[in-house]
């Protein structure tokens, strides 16, 4: 009797393929179950308030911008609007936007607080080393309008101007007070990637005589996103629209020209305007900024191929750092002693801490570019630690120990958004 070995092997091949498919299906079901749980946890948390987390008394604009999608979905839109408009009530005559505000009888941290006659129940402050407050506010308004459909908010009057006019003044503040003519980009103090701590001071949140001004990718990418958002929702005449289109076009050109290192396929950490505060004993150019790169991707500053390369580089850095997720802020980290603020040691806080607050946004970008396998891979460890810790935390050590504020709404917001985007693909 003659027979072919193929007939014997075929059932084994089919069994192997079936087993592989079952494993893949099981992993997918597991991820979706985790996502459903974390999404509900995020909604439950964000129904409870608007502060950044249990460790903060303030409503911070950079945080609010990252959970306003959820807040506008699960909370009364009139309440969300009130908290958003309060930032405009604190806007300064030069157009600048504060970081956060807190009930006037509840201040506890040593910020230089200031008051607003339009919101006497609060006091506010601004971390002047950072240059993302104005951009964050415009992005937050954009998200609020998209979810609620409340375009009328732009015509509301605050301090004698419409909200739209005040938002435009915020952008003009950046072009007037934070713009470097040589490079055609905006500047801030030297910080670690997207951070708000400069190295020259034991706290490091305010510009001073020791500040080293620098241009970085995070601030400029945030501004690009903000202008594009403004162009989407604002009612403008032809001349006004052309002006802002030219501004954003110039920013994008100059970002690629001066900040993008084509050979290394990464963004330069800083362009210094009055020298570097760091020792020349290490090469800062080797540092890869995860957060700033993520925001650059959101600003459409990288090609699809470069997005994939960026993700692979982030995962490579995670392995080298023995970290837990691509929320790793940067790698390699700044050495011991680089920052006078002792909380900024290696793998601590913004110097190599692991922040879902930014890693979750990279997941969203992977989804947007169609890299769904990579998005799920990146998302899984972020969901796992939320479930394990029974809540949301500000940041994590490389070995996944939660640090900083609990009930951190920024983490909840970006995970909620990524989960919604991922399962909208089906």
Model-derived segments and spans:
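Catalytic cores of carbohydrate-active enzymes
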Residues: 23-43, 59-60, 97-100, 175, ...
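Aromatic-rich carbohydrate-recognition surfaces in CAZymes
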Residues: 58-85, 90-186, 217-221, 353-363, ...
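Amphipathic alpha-helical segments within well-ordered protein domains
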Residues: 68, 228-231, 297, 363-367
């Amino acid at each position: 009797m003659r027979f072919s070995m193929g007939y014997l092997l075929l059932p084994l091949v089919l069994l192997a393929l079936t087993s592989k498919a079952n494993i893949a299906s099981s992993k997918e079901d597991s991820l979706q179950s985790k996502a459903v749980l974390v999404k509900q946890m995020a909604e439950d948390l964000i129904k409870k308030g608007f502060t950044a987390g249990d460790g903060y008394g303030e409503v911070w604009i950079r945080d609010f911008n990252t959970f306003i999608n959820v807040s506008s979905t699960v909370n009364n839109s009139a309440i969300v609007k009130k908290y958003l408009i309060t930032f405009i009530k604190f806007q300064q005559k030069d157009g600048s936007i504060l970081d956060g505000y807190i009930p006037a009888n509840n201040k506890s941290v040593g910020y230089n607080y200031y008051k607003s006659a339009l919101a006497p129940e609060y006091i506010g402050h601004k971390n002047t080393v950072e240059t993302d407050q104005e951009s964050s506010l415009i992005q937050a308004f954009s998200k609020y309008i998209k979810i609620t459909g409340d375009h009328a908010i732009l015509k509301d009057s605050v301090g004698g101007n419409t909200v739209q006019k005040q938002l435009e003044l915020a952008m003009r503040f950046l072009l007037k007070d934070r713009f470097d003519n040589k490079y055609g980009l905006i500047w801030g103090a030297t910080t670690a990637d997207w951070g708000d701590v400069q190295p020259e001071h034991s706290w490091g949140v305010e510009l001073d005589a020791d500040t080293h001004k620098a241009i970085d990718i995070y601030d400029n990418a945030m501004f690009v996103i903000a202008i594009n958002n403004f162009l989407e929702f604002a009612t403008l005449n032809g001349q006004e629209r052309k002006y802002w289109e030219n501004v954003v076009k110039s920013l994008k050109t100059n970002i690629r020209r001066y900040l993008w290192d084509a050979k290394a396929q990464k963004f330069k950490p800083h362009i210094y305007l009055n020298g570097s505060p760091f020792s020349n004993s290490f090469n800062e150019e080797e540092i890869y900024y995860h957060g700033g790169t993520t925001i650059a991707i959101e600003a459409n500053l990288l090609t699809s191929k470069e997005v994939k390369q960026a993700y692979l580089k982030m995962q490579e850095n995670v392995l080298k750092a023995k970290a837990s997720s691509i929320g790793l802020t940067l790698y390699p980290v700044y050495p011991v002693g680089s920052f006078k603020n002792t909380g900024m040691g290696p793998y601590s806080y913004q110097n190599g801490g692991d922040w879902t607050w930014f890693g979750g946004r990279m997941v969203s970008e992977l989804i947007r570019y169609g890299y769904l396998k990579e998005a799920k891979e990146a998302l899984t460890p972020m969901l796992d630690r939320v479930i394990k810790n029974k809540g949301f935390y500000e940041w994590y050590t490389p070995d996944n120990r939660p640090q900083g504020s609990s009930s951190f709404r920024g983490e909840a917001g970006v995970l909620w958004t990524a989960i919604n985007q991922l399962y909208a693909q089906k």
